[in-house]
Amino acid sequence: MANIKSQIKRIRTNEKARQRNKAYKSELKTHVRKVREAVTAGDKETASDALQVASRKLDKAVSKGVIHKNQAANRKSALAKQVSGL
């Protein structure tokens, strides 16, 4: 445990950010999973709708600093490729 007051505050702040990022990443995984499930089911309309939502969530995560922009681009590209393959 830190002894310096500013470091104690940073530990608290970092923990809050970690919890926030964890929740956001969990939400991202849920939306990506919905796209993949729609693709495996062969439902093109649902898959394209889910892809649109997932892409929006990925972009939002980038703007909030939760994930890197290249990671979001790679995920969106892979999902779009799967959906277009239907």
Curated annotation (Swiss-Prot):
Similarity remark: Belongs to the bacterial ribosomal protein bS20 family.
Gene3D superfamilies reported for this sequence: Ribosomal protein S20
Function: Binds directly to 16S ribosomal RNA.
BP GO annotations: translation
UniProt organism field: Beutenbergia cavernae (strain ATCC BAA-8 / DSM 12333 / CCUG 43141 / JCM 11478 / NBRC 16432 / NCIMB 13614 / HKI 0122)
Designated gene of the protein: rpsT
MF GO annotations: small ribosomal subunit rRNA binding; structural constituent of ribosome
Assigned GO CC terms: cytosol; small ribosomal subunit
Keyword vocabulary terms for this entry: Ribonucleoprotein, Ribosomal protein, RNA-binding, rRNA-binding
Biased composition annotated in UniProt, kind: Basic and acidic residues: 12-25
Region (Disordered): 1-25
Organism superkingdom: Bacteria
Protein name stated in the entry: Small ribosomal subunit protein bS20
